Amino acid sequence: SAGISCAIGGDDTYRLLPYLMEDEEFIKAVEEHPKLFTGFSDTTINHLMFYKLGLSTYYGPNFICDLGEIADEMLPYTKRAFESYLEGNESDEIISSDTWYEEREDFSRAAIGTERKTHKEERGFELLQGSEIFQGGLLGGCLESLYDVLTNSRYEDEKEVCERYDLFPNKEEWIGKILFIETCEEKPTPELFEREVLLLKEKGVFDVVNGVLVGKPQDEAYYQEYKDILIRVIDNEKLPIVYNVNFGHAMPRCALQYGAVAKVDMKQKKIYVNR
């Protein structure tokens, strides 16, 4: 096959690690036969595993949520991201979508062919602080998944399993990177969001990255609260933070390639990615 699209997330994805990271045949296949790999949410675990093995993957559309969209057509902005995989371009240009969509509440047969509720994008990419232009290699994922990797908040053995394979990048690996993070469909409360951001701070991530990209919250849940927490907890006014980027759980979504060098230009309100 030419590539793999994850079906959806999978909150116990970490349980795959012993079966894959100790399989020499699998590791050799990753090295010798690299393939396109795309997905988001708890797929973050897979992305970090492949990143460790040297494969550059895409935090982007998945099968059920995007290719399986129950409206008549895939969302145009997301479709463009998916098509970019197939075109093989050496660079990509990401702009804000002019429309955002609410998450569906009805996934029954009766909803087939119905359109999502839409809203005009009023804000676009927001520079919360720091330089208007910055660049670095892309690294990150779903904030809740990263938190789960570092704690036993969801499963009692997840932290131990992930530590065994050094899944979370060490501080040196974050140097010069652009951290990208986004919140999941559970719409974490501001209190939980603060704990999650604080944990990344305690790991020293914000001391060494060149900037932060934050995805639009699904349905714009806690939109202002999250902004306030990011600025207060990170507490480094020189670190660029760009908010409301179209990736992750909110519809529509672009694709961010792990390890690819991105140049964020907020004068142009664009993100340029060299693959």
Model-inferred region functions:
Residues 56-144:
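Conserved anion/nucleotide-ligand pocket segment
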Residues 1-31:
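N-terminal small/polar loop signature for handling phosphorylated ligands or for N-terminal nucleophile
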Residues 4, 42, 146, 212, ...:
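Buried hydrophobic positions in well-ordered alpha/beta secondary-structure cores of metabolic enzymes
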Residues 137-190:
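Oxyanion-binding "anion nests"
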Residues 20-50, 56-64, 240:
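Short, acidic/small-residue loops that bind anionic groups at enzyme active sites
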Residues 5, 38, 178-182, 213:
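Structural motif
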Residues 183, 187-275:
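C-terminal active-site/capping subdomain that shapes the small-molecule cofactor and substrate pocket
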Residues 43-90, 236, 245-275:
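Peripheral docking tails and interdomain loops at the edges
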